[in-house]
Amino acid sequence: MNVPVAISGGGIIGNYISLRLKRNNIDSLIIEKSDYMPDMSEGIRTLTLNNHSMSLLKAEGIDIESAPINEINALDGEGTGKIQFLADDINESHLSHVVMFNDLKNRLTELCKDKTLFNNEINSIQKFNSEDTSEAILKDGDSLHAQIIAGCDGRNSNIAKITGLPNEHYEYKQTAITFIGHVINNNNSLIAHQAFSEKGIFALMPMPNKDSKKNRYTIVWSIDNSILQNISPTEYVKNNLSFFESKLNIKIEVNSEILNFKLSNHHFKNYIKDSVVLIGDAAHSIHPLAGQGINLGLADADIFCEEIINAYNKGLKINNKAILKKYEIRRKGMNLLMLKSMDFFVDFFSSKNLYIILLRNFGLNSVNKTKFLKAFFMRHASGLNKF
């Protein structure tokens, strides 16, 4: 087989790239290790898409049900600090949109199924070549020749392992607890909440209203691993949910199973090796504090496609090293900045030091009074500042 772009991983990022390239007359083939089996259950996993991510998906004909957010309120549960972000302050109708992961994944998979090899995987790359084509050996024994091999296969990327590129990894020593909650006394379903305290980082995001189910929220609650040594996540939620209900002045009913996963980040020092490119979680991951992981991945995919399409339209080789390097340069700095920023906020808002608590309360209140600073943060988080 011979194809201009081989995409390892049929997730959201890989499928998006395939659709974008197809619209611009560049053929691609997705190699996906799982079977073609759409998950028709709603699930509890959600994604928070910023305005830029939504516009990228809509340009490819992806328009799924979402819960818009036009206000985000963040407060310090150990003091009086708070900050309010409003879409009106940056002349936008919304700050972000929450979608169901399965809805988006199923829609993309359906659109790309004819360009996907399911139940297969790239086992090795026999020849890395940025001048001609690279040769990949698949799990079924077939070989594949491609000008570019795009690793979009997630944070445990097999393609990343094959490249041998250096990688930095950090364990936060935290666990994220996530579940769906019904907010009983809620008068505005367009508001997201975030609270920081010694009981963890608590985020409450509205969910799409399906089958007349209203006032449903997805909760992501990050706590220190040490807390769960003698108590289960379910018991911890049962014993401590009232603390955040009191802080946010709401009542929450747990409406789903309670899941949990360990938190860590990683970042590759380089995103390319000859004609092999790492994109999205294959190249980097961050703390879910701000829900920016998927947005960074789609921003990667956007710039990757932009550079490849520009080269193709100019009659240049799409795997020219200078072109692929432009993608790396444009995205690596932004991703690293977001990763380091999240690490700072996690440490800052997890601290139990009294002086740090006083400082962050002062900081939140000061930024809340400074419109241009708030506007800068909001425009950046919304993906409106493109580099």
PLM segments and residue spans:
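Beta1/beta-strand and adjacent pyrophosphate-binding region of the FAD-binding site
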Residues: 1-11
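Residues at the starts of beta-strands that form the adenosine-phosphate
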Residues: 4, 27, 215-216
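N-terminal Rossmann-fold NAD(P) dinucleotide-binding loop
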Residues: 14-15
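Glycine-rich FAD pyrophosphate-binding loop
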Residues: 22-43
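Conserved N-terminal helical subregion
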Residues: 55-59, 67-162, 170-178
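Conserved FAD-binding catalytic core of PHBH/FMO-like flavoproteins
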Residues: 149-249, 258
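FAD/FMN-dependent oxidoreductases across multiple families
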Residues: 227-312, 319
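C-terminal helical "tail/cap" subdomain of flavin- and related membrane-associated enzymes
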Residues: 306-387
